From Swiss-Prot:
It is found in: Mitochondrion membrane. Keywords: Membrane, Metal-binding, Mitochondrion, Transit peptide, Zinc. Substrate binds at R103, G104, D105, Q118, E119, R152, Q164, Y231. InterPro entries: LbH_gamma_CA-like (IPR047324), Transf_Hexapept/Carb_Anhydrase (IPR050484), Trimer_LpxA-like_sf (IPR011004). Disulfide bonds: none annotated. It comes from Arabidopsis thaliana. GO terms for cellular component: cytosol; mitochondrial membrane; mitochondrion; plant-type vacuole; respiratory chain complex I. Residues 1-33 form a transit peptide. Its main location: mitochondrion. This is Gamma carbonic anhydrase-like 2, mitochondrial. Involved in complex I assembly in mitochondria and respiration. Zn(2+) binds at H124.
Length: 256
């Protein structure tokens, strides 16, 4: 009997000691896991240091329509997010700024020498004009078209300023050395005579421009042309795809 009790007590002591050791072991492991910082997964792809960082938004700058392809002079500045579609011609020294849309799907659109179409402008043309005047949109030389303006089948003669947020409707005509104030609406067939300042909705005659004011009009266009040169210098004429070609040739062991 005494021997049996001794064996039972020995087993119970052994099991108790073993369970205490197990608890201590797992507790120590849990503390070690909790205090050990989980290693961050290593990046699987390491970008090449010479790789061009593309900013692709899926927007096309030049959109041919049928047989019509937009034409841009070599020294004209057209911002990357501008859309030129169809019968559009951008002449030398001119500039078309960010977000503008020139839609020549129905008729011709021309931006003349040293003229500028500023941010978010929309320029388009109708099949025909109810006034009997040409339905194409013509922006002649040394013309400044302010931001957020809308031009449709209108004619702007040389050395004019169109204020921002203005609307020029079908058949409207702005004669040379004239100014249309910001936020104005020029109704269909309305004509602004040479050397006058107009404004309002609908646009009305305000006063005659002084000789000094008319001389400042082309200077503004030239100043914007010089500003566009700073932007133009940041873009290569044929993009940066040549870097990818050189890298591909190098990977194939082809002499560059």
């Amino acid at each position: 009997m005494a021997t049996s009790l001794a064996r039972i007590s020995k087993r119970s002591i052994t099991s108790a000691v073993s369970s205490n050791l197990i608890r201590r072991y797992f507790a120590a492991e849990a503390v070690a896991v909790a205090t050990t910082e989980t290693p961050k997964p290593k990046s699987q792809v390491t970008p090449s240091p010479d790789r061009v960082k593309w900013d692709y938004r899926g927007q096309r700058q030049i959109i041919p329509l049928g047989q019509w392809l937009p034409k841009v002079a070599v020294d004209a500045y057209v911002a990357p997010n501008v859309v030129l579609a169809g019968q559009v011609t951008v002449w030398d020294g001119s500039s078309v700024w960010n977000g503008a849309v020139l839609r020549g799907d129905l008729n011709k659109i021309t931006v003349g020498f040293c003229s500028n179409v500023q941010e978010r402008c929309v320029v388009h043309a109708a099949w025909s004009s109810p006034t009997g005047l040409p339905a194409q949109t013509l922006i002649d030389r040394y013309v400044t078209v302010g931001a957020y303006s809308l031009l449709r089948s209108c004619t702007i003669e040389p050395e004019c300023i169109i204020g921002q947020h203005s609307i020029l409707m079908e058949g409207s005509l702005v004669e040379t050395r004239s100014i249309l104030e910001a936020g104005s609406v020029l109704p269909p067939g309305r004509r602004i005579p040479s050397g006058e300042l107009w404004g309002g909705n609908p646009a009305r005659f305000i006063r005659t421009l002084t000789n000094e004011e008319t001389l400042e009009i082309p200077k503004l266009a030239v100043a914007i042309n010089h500003l566009s040169g700073d932007y133009f210098s940041e873009f290569l004429p044929y993009s940066t795809i040549y870097l990818e070609v050189e890298k591909f040739k190098k990977s194939l062991g082809i002499a560059i």
